[in-house]
Amino acid sequence: MLLTQRENNILKKTIEDFISFGAPISSQRLHSCYFNQFSTATIRNSLANLEKIGMLKSIHRSSGKVPTDNGYRYYVDTLIAESSKTIQEYDNIAQKLSAASNNLEDLLQATAYMLGKISRLFGIVVISKHQKNILNEIELIHLSSDRIMLVLGLNSGFIRSIVLNLKVSIDDSVLKVINQGLKDRLTGLTLDEIQESIKERLKESQYFEHEIVQILVQDPIKHFVISGQKLVYTSSFYQLLDYPEFHEINKLKTLMSFFYEKSLEEYLNNYLSDDHNNVIIGREIGDSNFRNCSIVSKPFENNNINGQMLVLGPKRLPYKDIKIILTNFTDIINNVI
């Protein structure tokens, strides 16, 4: 869609004023605050054209204009430029997240919290499913003569332990041999690869018929999976209370209930698995719970873990600033993991 330069300028200032103050914008306000070189009649005609093509709308007939979802989309795609600006709080954020980096779950939770605090919106960190993570460590630990703990350590930093109950006792020397054999044949593989090929990899080993190996071979999907770990980390909803859009308690309760249900994880992972814009606005999100919201996301990835950082807020969130914040956060997290 081709707009004149004047229409672009007027649309940009209309949206940015609404983002800042949350009130419909009149031609008089645009004239007095931004465009005194244009008459109010000229500005009014431009606003009428922008409304006609669906970029703006009137809440009431006599009120000023507010952006539509299409207006926000055009603003994000066309009217704001990418920026490599470093936020003022960068060093402080990096220091705090680095201090939490010894424990991956603590780091991800701290990241979501700081993201919400700095953006003054709702921060979310979503990590990808673990099945593509690589097995770095596997340990068999004696709990008793017939109980063994299997410990899996992934390159992402996640650890899983599961107790194996045996029908016969096992001594330390045999356990040590089996443990070393599992290390030799399984470490360096992804969990998916182990699930698909464990029987083939172990069938020629001297201990293949041992009960421990048979337990693992007969049900690899049960044992070589990282389950029960959080995949979604969130900040507090407290920041959203600063916005009039969330003052109506029923709207906020509906949003909160959705975010604290299991469906959140499924929804975000389905959304993040597709090729998509890093900004989705209102009805683009595809769920009625979010029709008055926008989500801005940014991927992060290194050798250990990958995922997305997201910020959710009202549709009038400061898109340019949020994109800068997310870029800074992904840079920090890629350095500290």
Residue ranges and their predicted role:
Residues 59-61, 85-88:
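Short Lys/Arg-enriched helix C-cap and helix-to-coil transition segments
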Residues 13-16, 20, 27-79:
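N-terminal helix-turn-helix
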Residues 11-16, 295-298:
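Contiguous, well-ordered alpha-helical segments that form the cores/surfaces of helical PPI scaffolds
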Residues 80, 87-319, 323-337:
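Intrinsically disordered, acidic Ser/Thr/Pro-rich low-complexity regulatory segments
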Residues 2-3, 38, 67, 317:
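Alpha-helical hairpin
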Residues 1-12:
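Short alpha-helical segments that sit at the start of domains
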Residues 1, 76, 80-83:
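Generic N-terminal leader/targeting and pre-domain segments
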